[in-house]
Design a protein with these regions (language model features):
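Short glycine-/small-residue-rich Rossmann-like dinucleotide-binding loops
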Residues: 58-59, 82
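Aromatic/hydrophobic pocket-lining residues that form π-stacking "cages" and hydrophobic walls in ligand
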Residues: 22, 66, 89-92, 116, ...
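C-terminal substrate-binding/catalytic lobe of Rossmann-fold NAD(P)-dependent oxidoreductases
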Residues: 8-12, 17-48, 61, 125-230
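Short acidic/histidine-rich motifs immediately flanking catalytic phosphotransfer sites
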Residues: 47-55, 72-77
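ADP-ribose/adenylate-binding Rossmann-like module
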Residues: 69-87
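Rossmann-fold NAD(P)-binding glycine/threonine-rich loop
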Residues: 81-101, 108-119
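Hydrophobic beta-strand scaffold residues
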Residues: 34, 77-78, 99-102
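A generic structural signal for well-ordered alpha-helical segments
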Residues: 26, 70, 93-95, 124
Length: 230
């Protein structure tokens, strides 16, 4: 059997919670054929080490700097950084020369939860809708990027999303549908940040094989579903 080539990751935001989780999972899962060959700090404009993909979980400014680095070296760019400026999002969505992946939440289970909420919106059109999210006290954006994404699918303005910041909560999202007769609540609760970090490893392995263009969780989910049918 032909040995798979190791994918060298340039990790932007390695000191953050997600960066640390990604680094640890790469080390714990050698069968994934990924290594962190380089890390990048704020304001660092160049990298001496070789890399095959830029993975970013940092800040809006850090994400933009990391993208320029990916463009410079013509390497795939994967980011899960939230609260990105609209002009930069448009730039990512318009990219054609390198593979670019963006998702405010990289978990497949959260993606399918969002799809379930969309179906519920179609089923309970006469119901009052509400969305509540809980994250750890260190999270800077509120509501979260994931909550904004779910709210969009529910037809709710971001201002109507309620939120809490409690302890070290990884992430909980609850969509509620209420009528005079009953109430339905759909909830996704992440209990470990490894849920997201493990998905990043799979997305990175997938993205390096893609052609130039913009990709989302929808594209990755379709790939995974096809893979399961084989």
């Amino acid at each position: 059997m032909k040995k798979l080539q190791t994918v060298r990751v340039l990790l932007n935001g390695a000191s953050g919670k997600m960066g640390q989780a990604i680094t640890r999972l790469i080390a714990e899962n050698p069968q994934k054929n990924l290594i962190v060959s380089a890390t990048r700090g704020p304001g660092q404009s160049d990298i001496k080490e070789s890399f095959d993909i830029v993975v970013d979980f940092s800040t809006p400014q850090g994400a933009q700097e990391a993208f320029l680095l990916a463009k410079k070296y013509k390497k795939p760019f994967l980011t899960g950084t939230t609260n990105l400026p609209e002009p930069f999002l448009f730039t990512l969505q318009s990219e054609e020369k390198i593979p670019v992946f963006f998702a405010p939440n990289v978990s497949l289970s959260v993606y399918f939860f969002t799809e379930l909420v969309k179906q519920a919106c179609n089923m309970y059109k006469g119901y009052q809708k509400a969305l509540h999210e809980i994250h750890h006290v260190h999270k800077k954006d509120a509501p979260s990027g994931t909550a904004k994404r779910i709210a969009t699918e529910m037809g709710l303005p971001a201002e109507q999303v309620t939120y809490e910041r409690l302890g070290e909560t990884v992430g909980t999202h609850s969509a509620t549908f209420s009528s005079a007769l009953d109430e339905i609540t759909l909830t996704h609760k992440a209990t470990n940040r490894d849920l997201f970090a493990a998905s990043v490893l799979d997305i990175a392995t997938w993205l390096v094989k893609r052609q130039g263009g913009f990709y989302t969780m929808s594209d990755f989910a379709k790939f995974k579903l096809k893979e399961k049918k084989k």
